[in-house]
Amino acid sequence: MIRRGDVYLADLSPVQGSEQGGVRPVVIIQNDTGNKYSPTVIVAAITGRINKAKIPTHVEIEKKKYKLDKDSVILLEQIRTLDKKRLKEKLTYLSDDKMKEVDNALMISLGLNAVAH
């Protein structure tokens, strides 16, 4: 089953303009109820181009810890809804602490403020 925090290879083509494309890693950011019942999934693109400008919507992930080909950056300003058929292979999953970083960067990307419970 696809779960929030899983990292998959996905085919993001075709693209336009500055969108991330090709077959590349993505992290699942959709909630697990949606992951279970929906034919689509919400993801954030991951790039291995670590020299990209570090901005508050970027979260770094280490290749050794997450069994990736290279140190990478999750681009929370590059979120997309994909058909699950675009997901190819599960690579790894992110730790709870790393997902907290993802959540924070996602809130910044979407202009959301933290809500007190």
UniProtKB/Swiss-Prot annotation:
The entry's keywords: Endonuclease, Hydrolase, Nuclease, RNA-binding, Toxin-antitoxin system
Pfam family, one: PemK_toxin
Source organism superkingdom: Bacteria
Disulfide bonds: none
GO terms assigned for molecular function: DNA binding; RNA binding; RNA endonuclease activity
InterPro entries: PemK-like, Plasmid_toxin/cell-grow_inhib
RNA-binding keyword on record: yes
Biological process, per Gene Ontology: mRNA catabolic process; rRNA catabolic process
Record-listed E.C. numbers: 3.1.-.-
Function summary: Toxic component of a type II toxin-antitoxin (TA) system. Ribosome-independent, sequence-specific endoribonuclease that cleaves mRNA, thus inhibiting protein synthesis and inducing bacterial stasis. It cuts between the first and nucleotides of 5'-UACAU-3' in single-stranded RNA. Neutralized by coexpression with cognate antitoxin MazE.
UniProt subunit comment: Forms a complex with MazE which is no longer active as an endoribonuclease.
Family statement: Belongs to the PemK/MazF family.
Name of the protein in its database record: Endoribonuclease MazF
Organism: Staphylococcus aureus (strain bovine RF122 / ET3-1)
Designated gene of the protein: mazF
